[in-house]
Structure formats: C-alpha cells, structure tokens
Amino acid sequence: MTTVRQVYEAMQAIAPLELAEHWDNPGLLVDCGGQMHRVLAALDITPEVVEEAARKGCGLIVSHHPVIFDPLKKIGPQDVPFQLVQAGISAICMHTNLDAAEGGVNEVLAGIFDMKNMETFAEGCGRVGRIEPVTVPELAKKAQKELASRCNQPFNGPAVQVKFADTGKTVRRLAVISGAGGSLFEDAIAQGADCLLTGEANHHHAIDAKRLGLSLIAAGHYATEFPVTAAVAEKLRTAFPELEVLVSEDARDPYTYL
C-alpha cells in the first residue's frame, strides 16, 4: 500500500514548496503515518470533511487551504487538527504553491475559459492570456455556469454567486487569480488585461479597477478554487494507480446565496 510520505513527495512534485509565499504554511501538517489505500481531495478540511474521510475509510486528506495556519496555542476536541489525529487521518495542505504551480489552481481556472498564450502575473500566482472576445456580462454568466458545474451543490440557493464591475469594453485579454485576488487589479492592468476574474474583491477594488479601465468579476472564493480538487485527484491517480483517490462531496461553500 501507499504511505503518507510517498503521497507527500508526489504532492511536492505537483506543487513545489518553494513556490509558496513566505507567510504561508503548506506541507504535511498532520502526520499520522502508516499506509493507506484511499485518499480524499478537498478545498478545506472542516469537521464535515473529516467525518466524510473517516466514513469513507480515507487515511489522508489532501487540501488546498492549510488546516494549521496561525501558531497553535492550545488544542481541543473542537479543533480540526485534534479531530484528524483522533481519527488517525493525516493532512497534506498545498496552498499558495498550488496556486502558482503548473496545472494548479489558477491554470485550472484559466482552462475553464479556454485561455491561450498563457502568462503568469502577480509574482507567478495568477494567469493572463487571450480568450475569445466576449462582453463582461456574458463572461460573468459563463463563469457562473461553468464553476457551478464543477462545485458541490449547496443545500439551498444557487451554487455560485457572481458580481461584476463592467467598463463596457469587450474582453479579449483575461487575467484570473483565484480566491481573494481583488487587490491585485493593478497587476492585471500592468499585463494589459481587459478584465480580472477572481474569487473575492471589495467595494474599493471594483471602483478603482473600473476607474482605471479594468473590468472586474468576483465569482466566489470557493467557486474559483474548488475545481482544482478534481485535477489534484487525477494527478494522484496517475502517480499511484493502486490508490483510490476521491473528491470530497461534503466540501461546500460556507455561504448560502439568495
């Protein structure tokens, strides 16, 4: 059977640790050791995801967001790392290194929009390139449809909520950066983008981007990042044919949208 360490080595090849931001905490964050025959890929490690992994007999969860980020001062039954150890489940978390990696979060996101002549921006994290000419409302609708089809469906409300600030300019050059990337609009402008598609952007990001001639689409943190879980699962299946790799069905957007 496959060991946790073997999967960790494979994940380091997929998302090299040197690509991570200095403030980040990627890696093998919970190591219960041993061998396993089943792995769960998820965006976040929540109590629901730990329960799912235990129910499905997964000895390891591979996630995007680190289950330990800030230094731990105490730990108890309500804390996810405690729950993982109690269940004997290890956790490998690849965060900003997976954002920047080839075939990682942002290349998966770019691929959804058939991006051509792809380049990096935002210190290698984001992707920018050519797409078929499209209006911002049309692009926002496509984002909502395509991302929803790749995410776990919520119990109530729509799967994806998209908002946009439209300059009225046709989008031919698109920049994408998943998650909380709204503050990077000036980096997108510097790369000649007509529009930045990200997960989260605040009020002032939208005002300033539009004033500077850049349209902005915010399609949700969860929605812009969850699609990478299927890509990671497929890479692990290729690397370990004997390993059953599942994509979490209980990892959902924490928000409910009206």
Predicted features and spans:
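Hydrophobic structural segments
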Residues: 1-258
